Amino acid sequence: LKLVLISTLAVFTSGAGLFSSKNNDIATDKSIKSTKPWANIEGFRSAKFGMRMDEVKKSITRDFAIAGGKIDAISHPTEQTQSLGISVDNLLPNSGKSRVVYVFGYKSKRLMQVNILTGQPVDMDIKPQQVVDAGNLLGNHFFKKRYQEDGLVAHARLSDGSVLIFRGKDQKGRMALLRLSNPQPNAKKGDDLKITLTLSYI
């Protein structure tokens, strides 16, 4: 995908013009590379990469006080992977409902990826600016750590118009990826834009 660097975090150039960040303390690419300490991407909260499904269920209960009956078991029809899914309210301040999916390896049966979705269609009532604010908050969190220069991306627009807020790998090659979906390209002021923030730990 062709990447075109953009100067501000999570800015959509749609007709609505709603999505400019108010945060003036955005880190630059140079500061991301030199900032210490190194990032350590181990999983999500107490659920760590390499855990078995039963261990992740215990982590979910510990992290979110969600009982086993409210944890969804998901099977991918083509990749044949198994996942656990939960819904969480206000995972970030004023961010509405989020969907957290823990993905396990087909052969290893161990946790290998965590995907977190905020915004549409997880929460049909959330305001677009709430989703953008959540992206800004997460982006600035990632920018405080140091990552490998290889593959490091910040503030980039993808060819489909979506915004890659951040992509970076720790010293072990584990990745965090934060992406804000493209709103409707022909949206006008006042339109009900449907955008999604996706955070993946891989």
Set out the residue ranges of the language-model regions:
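Glycine-centered tight beta-turn/hairpin loop motif at sheet-sheet or coil-to-beta transitions
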Residues: 94-97, 171-173
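Short N-terminal edge-element motif at the start of the domain
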Residues: 59-95
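Non-cytosolic coordination micro-motifs
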Residues: 17-72, 113-202
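Bacterial N-terminal signal peptides
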Residues: 4-12
